[in-house]
Swiss-Prot record:
InterPro entries the UniProt entry points to: AB_hydrolase_fold (IPR029058), NDRG (IPR004142)
Gene3D superfamilies found in the cross-reference section: alpha/beta hydrolase
GO BP annotations listed: pronephros development; signal transduction
The protein's name: Protein NDRG1-A
4 X 10 AA tandem repeats of G-[NS]-R-S-R-[AS]-H-T-[DGN]-[DET] as annotated region, ranges: 340-379
SUPFAM superfamilies named in the record: alpha/beta-Hydrolases
Organism of this sequence: Xenopus laevis
PANTHER family: N-MYC DOWNSTREAM REGULATED
């Protein structure tokens, strides 16, 4: 196996920390960005490593959605001021799906693009060749699926997952038919747009939608995008299931934060995914006034939620929380907890579970009657529902 590397040095344009008492400005160290083309058993994958990995912390590993690359998907989030604090504590490894990076050449005729399972199996090679100990995944759409498959197959490599717009299910036959039609060049941008944005967003935020449409048309290799789209739409069901004591269920072993906008085209899929995961390790965050691009539309809320999540993993205990106020959430209660107390939020404070809302009220389930959040599982009787752990649901 070989890796090609290009070093690019850049410094922050302004100081991010200031010691006001001494009048001394503490500048962040210059970050070194290294681009690698890493050869794996399933082909070459392009990665961009930002910062130097720390031995006692995981590396944030990102994976983008179809029609995007790591820059168009995550730059708006990582360039946001509140994310700089996280960038100081963690190195970041951006993974571009094969052929999706800027300036990628078209695949030759007859090229067999990796399946979604094979894309996930490229990641252990990336982790090993870069000398990373463990990672914390941040993925959206197709990237969220790939990271989840990676975590299911290699749980020892993944400490946590932040999954935006995750769909754990295989595509239906209608979507399969749409994939066939997407072979026509003119249909591909529309198909990708319908995946990224809801109908409401297309009408309410036409400038943003048009920006990404132009990116798909002019800034990324459409032939390569088509391969990635077909691979995603041919994905298998992840077959995850909510664990039951005494059984060996297929589920994530690490903490997971599921994120979705309340008008996202993926909202139903994310709720279904939440219903299949371990409620003691999973938090569902629904963002109001947000569609399929929370990292672009609501970067402040997403950055704040990210901080809470990494605090729950034991990192950044002194991180500043300035954008959102926390409030109690009734959905965090767990009648089956060993200590009998209410379940805690994913922080090191030991305080009662809080949602990331600004009104300070208890978080309500997303139902019309405003009752407490229910676990999204099918139950055979009322008693089993009452005795099962409740998933934490948060609105912001």
């Amino acid at each position: 196996m070989s890796a090609e590397m290009t070093d690019l040095n850049f410094a922050e344009g302004r100081p991010l920390m200031t010691d006001k008492e001494d009048g001394i400005t503490v500048l962040l160290q210059e970050y070194v960005t290294q681009e690698h083309d890493i050869e794996t058993a399933h082909g070459i994958v392009h990665v961009t490593m930002c910062g130097t990995p720390k031995l006692n912390r995981p590396v944030i590993l990102t994976y983008h959605d179809i029609g995007l690359n790591h820059k168009t998907c995550f730059n708006s989030l990582f360039n946001f001021e509140d994310m700089h604090e996280i960038s100081q504590h963690f190195s970041v490894c951006h993974v571009d799906a094969p052929g999706q990076q800027e300036g990628a050449a078209s695949f030759p005729a007859g090229y067999m693009y990796p399946s979604m399972d094979q894309l996930a199996e490229m990641l252990p090679g990336v982790v090993q060749q870069l000398g990373l100990r463990t990672v914390m995944g941040l993925g959206i759409g197709a990237g969220a699926y790939i990271l989840t498959r990676f975590a299911l197959n290699h749980p020892s490599m993944v400490e946590g997952l932040v999954l935006i717009n995750i769909n754990p299910c295989a595509e239906g036959w209608m979507d399969w038919a749409a994939t066939k039609i997407s072979g026509w060049t003119n249909a591909l941008p529309d198909m990708v747009i319908s995946h990224l944005f809801s109908k409401d967003e297309v009408h309410s935020n036409p400038e943003l939608v048009e920006t990404y449409r132009q990116h798909i048309l002019h800034d990324i290799n459409q032939n390569n995008v088509q391969h990635f789209v077909k691979s995603y739409n041919s994905r298998r069901d992840l077959e995850i299931e909510r664990p039951i004591p005494g059984t060996n269920a297929v589920t994530l072993k690490c903490p997971a934060l599921l994120v979705v906008g309340d008008s996202s085209p993926a909202v139903d899929a994310v709720v279904e995914c939440n219903s299949k995961l371990d409620p003691t390790k999973t938090t569902l965050l629904k963002m109001s006034d947000c569609g399929g691009f929370p990292q672009v539309i609501q970067p402040a809320k997403l950055a704040e939620a990210f901080k809470y999540f990494v605090q729950g993993m034991g990192y950044m205990p002194a991180a500043s929380m300035t954008r959102l106020m926390r409030s109690r959430t009734g959905s965090a209660a767990s009648s089956s907890s060993q200590d009998g107390n209410r379940s805690r939020s994913h922080t090191n404070e030991g305080s009662r579970s809080r949602s990331h809302t600004g009104d300070g009220n208890r978080s309500r389930a997303h139902t019309g009657d405003g009752n407490r959040s229910r676990s999204h599982t099918d139950t055979n009787n009322i008693n089993s529902d009452q005795n099962s752990p409740k998933s934490m649901e948060v609105s912001c």
